[in-house]
Curated annotation (Swiss-Prot):
<comment type="similarity">
    <text>Belongs to the intron maturase 2 family. MatK subfamily.</text>
</comment>
<dbReference type="InterPro" id="IPR024942">
    <property type="entry name" value="Maturase_MatK_N"/>
</dbReference>
<keyword id="KW-0694">RNA-binding</keyword>
<dbReference type="Pfam" id="PF01824">
    <property type="entry name" value="MatK_N"/>
</dbReference>
<dbReference type="GO" id="GO:0006397">
    <property type="term" value="P:mRNA processing"/>
</dbReference>
<dbReference type="GO" id="GO:0009507">
    <property type="term" value="C:chloroplast"/>
</dbReference>
<dbReference type="InterPro" id="IPR002866">
    <property type="entry name" value="Maturase_MatK"/>
</dbReference>
<dbReference type="GO" id="GO:0008380">
    <property type="term" value="P:RNA splicing"/>
</dbReference>
<dbReference type="Pfam" id="PF01348">
    <property type="entry name" value="Intron_maturas2"/>
</dbReference>
<dbReference type="GO" id="GO:0008033">
    <property type="term" value="P:tRNA processing"/>
</dbReference>
<keyword id="KW-0819">tRNA processing</keyword>
<dbReference type="GO" id="GO:0003723">
    <property type="term" value="F:RNA binding"/>
</dbReference>
<dbReference type="InterPro" id="IPR024937">
    <property type="entry name" value="Domain_X"/>
</dbReference>
<keyword id="KW-0507">mRNA processing</keyword>
<comment type="function">
    <text>Usually encoded in the trnK tRNA gene intron. Probably assists in splicing its own and other chloroplast group II introns.</text>
</comment>
<keyword id="KW-0934">Plastid</keyword>
<keyword id="KW-0150">Chloroplast</keyword>
């Protein structure tokens, strides 16, 4: 029973302070702008500086002090030309500030947890590339993978429930419900398939969705650590967090007192691995196909009956790792069977031994990468480089530096690719797009401008890694082939940037 105390104890870091009063503080909205995931709504109105934005916040706080003035009408933006086309501007400002406020209990809890456990701060583990060495070591020994799309059609009230355990301020929770029900039509478009990862969604909804996912993972991983074969009789322990600990404690009391072990078969599966990325997660295991089907329908019931989310079985795909590719963090990864023939001779007999072993490969999905280059106006839909007319007003050195920065950042991130051919194609597109942009600026042909730049211009597009490796190793066929097929993982990459952000 002692091993479950960490799950049964109530976290003493829960905060009971009133958070609602922080909505009347100007610095909260300044934090919302500086710490926001997206660009703040305060600065989306063209022609207004920080001083004008501060005036908006002061007017908002003054209005909130007045009774019955928190309910905003859509006519406010029409009657007042100061706000332009932004309807419900006040409500969006409050939602940004409120997103910062509700994160306070979670931030304090995280700091308290790190101090209590005295966890070492490892910057290497923060790198996005740190997950790939783990996949290389583990996935080659597994057989099946569940590719699951997390359901996002969630009732608005379900998003509030996980917060009730951490936020004890009833006024803040009521205000949150007010935002969700009063402005959901203006913030979420019901006619489209909306995911909570799109750029247009407010930060508050991103926080609510992430808190909901954390709630699901907390319960799911707890049960996964205790059991891999869960019977239907164990479904009684799935309840919302506010009653979760009481139910778990009662469950284990029944478990130990009544010898419930013959009904619930608990054991740990050391080969079960869980990875989540954006709106999907992977559950890989060494189990059989029948056992993975049990996990599939178990997850469907888990989401439908305990999180009230409609989960279709078709959103879960069971695949063999040797026949399946994972689209993960900008890579397409797979564990392929590689055969190697070994010739062995004993006396006069000659034997051919065929050894088959799994090898984890990561390649760059060239089609999706060219699609990103097309959206950023570096090439057309067929991958043919084009010029960027928006850069013709810049100096030549500035244009070259921008293209070099994009090329080196892409090469640095995709250095883990097992095959570099796709990466070289991307470099070619960026290099020729840079030349066409310069030629368009000076009103010359591409051939004439390439002769003017010379071969030194082409050498600038080599990454630092390629330059260093070319100096260390001799230019032999075997070495170049090994560098071409090898992959390198870096432990200094903490974010994925869009091509437009590289500029």
């Amino acid at each position: 029973m002692e091993e479950f105390q960490g799950y049964l104890e109530l976290d003493i870091s829960r905060q009971h302070d009133l958070l609602y009063a922080l909505l009347f503080r100007e610095y909260i909205y300044a934090l919302a702008h500086d710490h926001g995931l997206n660009r703040s709504i305060l600065f989306e109105n063209a022609g207004y500086d920080n001083k004008s934005s501060s005036i908006i916040v002061k007017r908002l706080i003054t209005r909130m002090y007045q009774p019955n003035r928190l309910i905003f009408s859509s006519k406010d933006s029409i009657q007042n030309p100061f706000f332009g086309h932004n309807k419900n501007l006040y409500s969006q400002i409050i939602s940004e500030g409120f997103a910062v406020i509700v994160e306070i209990p979670f931030s304090l809890r995280l700091v308290f947890s790190l101090e209590r456990k005295e966890m070492a701060k490892s910057h290497n583990l923060r790198s996005i590339h740190s997950i790939f060495p783990f996949l290389e070591d583990k996935f080659i020994h597994l057989d099946y993978v569940l590719d699951v799309l997390i359901p996002y059609y969630i009732h608005l009230e379900i998003l509030v429930q996980p917060l009730r355990y951490w936020v004890k301020d009833a006024s803040s929770l009521h205000l949150l419900r007010f935002f969700l029900h009063e402005y959901c039509n203006s913030l979420i478009t019901p006619k489209k398939h909306i995911t909570f990862f799109s750029k247009g969604n407010p930060r508050l909804f991103l926080f609510l969705y992430n808190s909901h996912i954390c709630e699901y993972e907390y319960i799911f991983l707890f049960l996964r650590n205790q059991s891999s074969h869960l019977r239907s009789t164990s479904s009684g322990i799935f309840f919302e967090r506010i009653y979760f600990y009481v139910k778990i404690z009662h469950f284990f009391k029944v478990f130990f007192d009544n010898n419930f072990q013959c009904i619930l078969w608990f054991f740990k599966d050391p080969f079960m691995h869980y990875v989540r990325y954006q709106g999907x997660f992977f559950l890989a295991s060494k189990d059989t196909s029948l056992q993975m089907n049990k996990w599939k329908y178990y997850l469907v019931n888990f989401w439908q009956y305990h999180f009230y989310a409609w989960f279709q079985p078709g959103r879960i795909n069971i695949n063999q790792l040797v026949k399946y590719s994972l689209d993960f963090l900008g890579y397409r990864s797979n564990a392929r069977l590689n055969s190697s023939l070994v010739r062995s001779q004993m006396l006069e007999n000659l034997f051919l031994i065929n050894n088959a072993m799994n090898k984890f490969e990561t390649i760059v999905p060239i089609i999706s990468l060219i699609g990103s280059l097309y959206k950023a106006n570096f090439c057309n839909t067929f991958g043919h480089p084009i010029s960027k007319p928006t850069r013709t007003d810049s100096s030549d050195s500035d244009i070259i530096d921008r293209f070099l920065r994009i090329c080196r950042n892409l090469s640095h991130y995709h250095s883990g690719s097992s095959k570099k051919k796709s990466l070289y194609q991307v470099k070619y597109i960026l290099r020729l797009s840079c030349v066409k942009t310069l030629a368009r600026k000076h009103k010359r042909t591409v051939r004439t401008f390439v002769k003017r730049l010379g071969s030194e211009f082409l050498q600038e597009f080599l990454t630092e890694e390629e330059v260093v490796l070319s100096l260390i190793f001799p230019r032999t066929y075997s070495t170049s082939r090994r560098l071409y097929r090898g992959h390198i993982w870096y432990l200094d990459i903490t974010s994925i940037k869009h091509l437009x952000n590289y500029e």
